[in-house]
Amino acid sequence: MAISVRDDGALHLQGDLHISDVEELRTVLIGRLETASELVLDLSGVDRCDTASLQLLCSVKKSAERDRKQLCISSLSPVVREVCTMTGLPL
């Protein structure tokens, strides 16, 4: 997994998202949401993902909403879209 910041401030995730990446990803997302009212994630570069990674995204999104902040997904790769559809996870 690689995380970069686009020119517009969105976080671009690239590569594979697996359970081994969950803690690092959680730290990055929570850290960004502590200093901003909105966080945009670009998942178009994600090649593979597991349900643990998607569950983390759903959890962070719910936490953000509870704190009256927004976690927005700007785009989903076909792989992420398929896993969301198969598991019923709403992103």
What spans do the regions from the language model cover?
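STAS-like cytosolic regulatory interaction modules
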Residues: M1-C49, S59-L91
